[in-house]
């Protein structure tokens, strides 16, 4: 009888009344732009107003260097990471630095967008394709088009030695295109230039210094919307992608709040925020931003983060040998 009465009383409680109210502090280390990071934090605070979140924003290599220094000092400060690429996350997982979130709801997400053991989770798909100036002699539709005589000396791209996205792109293309590294040998033979970051590529192609550029999608798409003479294509063979994964550090002092942050980022509402910010959301049911084709028209090539981590030094050496860097 007492059990029945208790069950009845529980049923009358408002939803969430039995759940522990989250509070305390969280520190997020992120490579997101400041505005994007704050909007993500605001989404958490809308549901959990007693959680106080601060963030440190920098490029992924500098974030990692900061973490390394803190690990060595025995004083890690971050609870959460939201950075550019899964290869970095895979390295931290291998070192035992990440806390798995076994309760994360990833039912809607395809394989490859998260760690199978739930240590990290993709939040976006930032693909790399081909931008071209509207004065270019032809509209590229294939990666092979950058090897055409008409493109000789007119191709620019970030170097995998300096850009994480470019390193993932190289690993993806050489792992999927027939001939592997012969494609990069062909680019070098066609006088392609490798150096700088994606911002430099955008400036070069939009300004007409080079007619073709290998670049992340959102930069030229946004620049075109502002009136710049630039177009972007998703090559027919497929594209590489970095996924801006989120993860919880094992040293967190507030694991439940950290898990709530991950849950919100992975939720449909959190993924729609990525859409509003102008990115391709990792959630397959979320629409794409203005200026993009349909999701079905974009083929994302397979990518193995663990293999890319194991091959990182070899891939950098191979690229440097080809391009003399």
Protein language model features and the residues they cover:
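Short beta-strand->loop
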Residues: 98-105, 119-122, 144, 212, ...
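Short alpha-helix C-terminal cap/hinge motif
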Residues: 39-55
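Sec/Tat signal peptide C-region and signal peptidase I cleavage site
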Residues: 13-19
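Mature extracytoplasmic/periplasmic domains
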Residues: 240, 249-303
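An extracytoplasmic/periplasmic, membrane-proximal ligand-sensing/linker region
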Residues: 180, 282-325
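Periplasmic-binding protein-like
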Residues: 111, 126-127, 185-187, 194-195, ...
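Extracytoplasmic ligand-binding site segments that recognize negatively charged/polar headgroups
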Residues: 23, 27, 31-38, 58-61, ...
